[in-house]
Amino acid sequence: LSEKNEFIEKSKREMNVSGFGFGSMGGFYTLAEVLSELDNMKVLFPNLITTKVSIGNTVESRPMYMVKISDNPEIDELEPEVLYTALHHAREPQSMMQMIYFMYYLLENYSTDPAIQYLVNNRELFFIPVVNPDGYEYNRITNPTGGGMWRKNRKNNGGSFGVDLNRNYGPYAYWNSPNGGSSTSPSSDTYRGTAPFSEPETINIKNFLATRNFKNALNYHTYSNLLVYPYGALSNETPDSLIFREYAMDMTEFNNYTYGTDMQTVGYSTRGNSDDYFYDGDTVLN
């Protein structure tokens, strides 16, 4: 408790963030608490953030919520759009917590920080803090004080449960890459599903992307201190790898994260992941 209080006071003092706190699930926000935080942001900063909007329902019929932060959040302005997602994997709540903190940082410092003013005034920032609400709620039910290790969604596979949402993206050539970067066994933590976009959660993301014109996207995970960019499914680098490296050098200057492709960072290949699809798996981010 003393460490939590110390963090909160340091955050107020050094980062001017007072809205962020700790949740009831081992310090992490529960799903209900995440939604409450989004509502609270709207009450406190009605001119900078939208009301939460569902982009579709999950396999267990839970809504997947999105909000937008911008200087005119209710208007679609001709500004570059950026997408942030978290909790593809239900056992990575720190990804969501970091996102909520970042959102409060933007909102609470907007009136005093010129850099944040520029960002919010000249970009449209979209946030999906819980891509996998079913899996996350399952962890709360089975481990209410925290520590739940369920990773996948809660698809009933007929004897086992769950599809790894970050192995369920298309296109087929990426999803079915011969690199072995996912499993065909329904009981595996990296089970890819029966086909690309077999799950409502990934379909919801795909459909949402098709309605926007995103110029960049960051998908938050919590495995190690890494900044990972495409490709995961292919052995070659992208045509934009030099640009990715330049961005990555700037983004890791202070945290010293390792950056690169899947093989260059985590040391293994993946297939059907969100980064590859967002990059060139469809026309949405091209």
For the regions a language model picked out, list residue spans one by one:
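Extreme N-terminal flexible tails
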Residues: 1-22
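Soluble metallo-hydrolase cores and metallopeptidase-like ectodomains found primarily
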Residues: 26-82, 152
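Stable alpha-helical elements in mature extracytoplasmic
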Residues: 34-37, 94-102, 119, 123, ...
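Sec-exported extracytoplasmic/periplasmic mature domains
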Residues: 39, 43, 103-112, 132, ...
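Structural recognition of the beta-strand scaffold that forms the well-ordered cores
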Residues: 51-56, 63-68, 81-85, 92-95, ...
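Enzymes and membrane/adaptor proteins characterized by extended Gly/Ser/Thr/Asp/Glu-rich
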Residues: 75-108
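Short helix-loop-beta-strand segments that form the rim/entrance of peptidase-like active sites
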Residues: 95-139
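Metallocarboxypeptidase
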Residues: 145-286
